[in-house]
Regions:
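Low-complexity, acidic/polar, glycine-enriched regions of mature
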Residues: 4-183
């Protein structure tokens, strides 16, 4: 997956040349090479695992300050949940026709030795704050990340007609892993 780069508009004709601005930080941009974005939810008494493909991430991270930003776009059409994929993509759950993407925009910071990406997760047209704790290992120009967070599907109106946890549980565990290269 390719990260989005900066778009620089050239100065208008006959304008004085622009001077280069000093970089805002030492944050490096990272290109995601491989990754998985999965989720687990209980349906009746069984765990159901699903995943999203085709997602993209724009990541800037400064190793010296252990801070950064991340923007993730997730196409709901890339969701697979086994035999229940059509139902999960339908109006009762993700309503892919009306809400074709989910997004996460986060700020990365370290607190008490734990890296966390914090910001709004938008699913099904509803934004709610989440904090995704993650482990990060950087070797040379390669970063490996692994994180997990649990959300409540009701917060996002997913399966709103399933008000009883015995059919579809309220908690949904989200797991993300990725390998990225420094640009």
């Amino acid at each position: 997956m390719v990260l989005a780069g900066l778009l620089i508009t050239p100065p208008p004709r006959n304008a004085a040349p622009a001077t280069a601005a000093a970089p805002a930080s030492a944050a490096a941009n990272w290109t995601v090479e491989t990754g998985t974005l999965g989720f687990t939810v209980k349906q009746m008494t069984a765990e159901v695992k699903g995943q999203f493909t085709g997602w993209t991430a724009t990541i800037a991270y400064d190793e010296s300050t252990r801070t950064g930003t991340v923007d993730v776009t997730i196409p709901i059409a890339g969701m697979t949940v086994g035999s229940v994929t059509p139902q999960a993509a339908g109006p009762e759950f993700f309503d892919m026709a009306k809400f074709p993407t989910a997004t996460f925009t986060g700020t990365i910071a370290e607190t008490n030795g734990q890296l966390t990406a914090t910001g709004p997760l938008t699913i099904h047209g509803t934004a709610a704050p989440i904090s995704l704790p993650f482990a990060l290992t950087i070797t040379g120009d390669t970063a490996q990340m692994k994180g997990q967070v649990t959300i409540d599907r009701r917060t996002f109106g997913i399966g709103a007609n399933y008000k009883d946890e015995t059919t579809v549980a309220f908690p949904v565990q989200i797991d993300v892993t990725l390998t990225a290269k420094r640009k």
